[in-house]
Amino acid sequence: MSQRKRYSLNVVTSPSIPSPTPSAPIRTNESNWEAASPASAASSFLPNVHHGGTVLNPGLGIMRSPSLNKSGAFGRSGSSGSSTVIEPSNIKLLLIGDANVGKTAMILSYCRELLTRAEMSRSARLRHQQQQQHKDLGLKKTVVNHRLSMKEKRKRYSSNDFEKEFKDINHFADETSDFGNPNIGDDNNHEMADPNEIVIETRSTIGIDIKTNLVNIDNRFFNVILWDTAGQERYQNAIIPSLYKKTNAVILTYDITNAKSFQSCMERWIVQALENFSSQDLLKARFFLVGNKIDLYKERQVTHYDVVQMVQEMQLKHGIKISGNFEVSCKWVNVVERTMNMIILDLVENGCFENNDPCVSITTSDDVQGHEQEFHDTVEEPFNFTRQRQHQLEKNNTVDITKPNDDIANNQSICCV
């Protein structure tokens, strides 16, 4: 055997040249999260399922924060440089109402899980390209297999057999070319539709569906938990006991094109909520009224006067104050998002959330107004900062013989001058 030279895979380097090391650790800030997030390029709230990395309504002070780990805990660095893991505070939103009023679509729109027509068109074209590649690959395999079979049976084939095989191949090509074409079945109305309009394709909720979203309000994290309930009566008995426990906001949802769903909020859903709320949970709960499908305003059956009248009836009959009433459309971008942000800010300002940070005390807007009133009461009386300087009277050393001497009363001896 001939001897072969063996080569080493290790590269020889000079010991005087150290290997390059980074001078400082690489830090990732929110701008990098936004640039790396695919949601910021495809949306005007986010494409993430539950968490995102873009700013929501900077005027409201709410920002969606990217998840740093699976548990959802975030680290806050102190002045000493050490970081402590603090769980975000929980805010539970419960959406109740009749079936087909759009509760599921509202939650998916807030979590940005609904696609627009432009995004649907891009995904359909991508799907069509992939199917076209599979089709071309399938045709090549079919032609190769056909040629192999022809070589094996060429002495048995006639002209009629060749014509039949040729027709079968053309029929297969026509079927695969039509499959997955995004232009087939589209109407002219779809071509004239708004590309930014959201396409709603949801199904009826069975039981309960829960979505979570992490938001940042003034550098404090809140875990927003949205509970989607079924509107059918057959699912109510199983979910009522644990439905209203630790609920911070009850969102009464109705369809503006369906007057019956609006009346159900007064006759059924608000009564059910008051019967199942505990006295302790009711103190930290607020009620909101949200009308959906305002894009169908021409078919409106619920007017603004009806809404104001129902709010007054709820307060007189049940003693419940409606903290806000809104009208939204899940087909319009950012409408549901702004409404949910206003509800969340109202809950935070009034201390209606589960505080998981023991170092932070809950201060509501009522407490702030009370402190301001006490301050104004104390300031009503003006302070007198003028000080009068009093001079100490010095005792005169001279003696007036015409007046009695005070030292005699003190049993002190005196001498006549």
Curated annotation (Swiss-Prot):
Gene that specifies this protein: YPT11
Keyword field contains Hydrolase: no
One annotated GO molecular function: GTP binding
Pfam families: Ras
Protein name per its UniProtKB record: GTP-binding protein YPT11
Region (Disordered): 1-34
InterPro entries xref list: P-loop_NTPase (IPR027417), Rab (IPR050227), Small_GTP-bd (IPR005225), Small_GTPase (IPR001806)
Family: Belongs to the small GTPase superfamily. Rab family.
Annotated source species: Saccharomyces cerevisiae (strain ATCC 204508 / S288c)
GO CC, one annotated term: Golgi apparatus
Task of the protein: Involved in the positive control of both endoplasmic reticulum (ER) and mitochondrion inheritance during cell divison. Required for the MYO2-dependent retention of newly inherited mitochondria at the bud tip in developing daughter cells.
Assigned keywords, A-Z: Endoplasmic reticulum, GTP-binding, Lipoprotein, Membrane, Nucleotide-binding, Prenylation
